[in-house]
């Protein structure tokens, strides 16, 4: 018989650095999930990834206090900042001050990596979404 799902929890955790301190510990603890078990499993699953990369994770927890988790690709903003080699977007996007520039090829690379997490039918649709995010961060898309 299948386990009864008690709920789902969405978190964003840095790769390789899950620990029981806030915000992870309290979020898991109040739902009765074994915090250290999650931290060990998550860190083991992300050990090959770049340390500190933000990873969205969806934790499904069951009434018997067990859990499973699914990891997604890092947010588009992370990829945009990494490709543009900047630490943050423009403070006033669209007002003249550009935070950096990206090429269509860089946008396509990001779109291919994020395709399974995006709500897009094809790569062109995914690229359009990512270009919109880039403009919202004050990045200029050229080429």
From Swiss-Prot:
CDD domains in alphabetical order: Ribosomal_L11
Identify the GO cellular component terms for this protein. Answer: cytosolic large ribosomal subunit
* Keyword Cell wall biogenesis/degradation found: no
Pfam families reported for this sequence: Ribosomal_L11, Ribosomal_L11_N
Per UniProt, the keywords (alphabetical) are: Methylation, Ribonucleoprotein, Ribosomal protein, RNA-binding, rRNA-binding
Q: Which GO terms describe its biological process?
A: translation
Enumerate the InterPro entries for this protein. Answer: Ribosomal_uL11, Ribosomal_uL11_bac-typ, Ribosomal_uL11_C, Ribosomal_uL11_C_sf, Ribosomal_uL11_N, Ribosomal_uL11_N_sf
Query: Can you summarize the PTM annotation of this record?
Result: One or more lysine residues are methylated.
Say what the protein does.
Forms part of the ribosomal stalk which helps the ribosome interact with GTP-bound translation factors.
Q: What assembly does the database describe for this protein? A: Part of the ribosomal stalk of the 50S ribosomal subunit. Interacts with L10 and the large rRNA to form the base of the stalk. L10 forms an elongated spine to which L12 dimers bind in a sequential fashion forming a multimeric L10(L12)X complex.
Family membership = Belongs to the universal ribosomal protein uL11 family.
Protein's name in the database = Large ribosomal subunit protein uL11
């Amino acid at each position: 018989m299948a386990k009864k799902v008690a709920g789902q929890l969405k978190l964003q955790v840095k790769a390789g650095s899950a620990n029981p301190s806030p915000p992870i510990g309290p979020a898991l603890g109040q739902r009765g999930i074994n915090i250290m078990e999650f931290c060990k499993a998550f860190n083991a699953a992300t050990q090959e990834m770049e340390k500190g990369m933000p990873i969205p994770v969806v934790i499904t927890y069951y009434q018997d206090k067990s859990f499973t988790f699914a990891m997604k690709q890092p947010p588009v903003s992370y990829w945009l900042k990494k490709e543009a080699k900047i630490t943050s977007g423009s403070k006033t996007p669209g007002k003249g001050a550009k935070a950096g520039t990206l090429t269509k090829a860089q946008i396509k690379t990001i779109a291919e990596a994020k395709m399974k997490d995006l709500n897009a039918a094809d790569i062109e649709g995914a690229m359009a979404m990512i270009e919109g995010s880039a403009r919202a961060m004050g990045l200029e898309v050229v080429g």
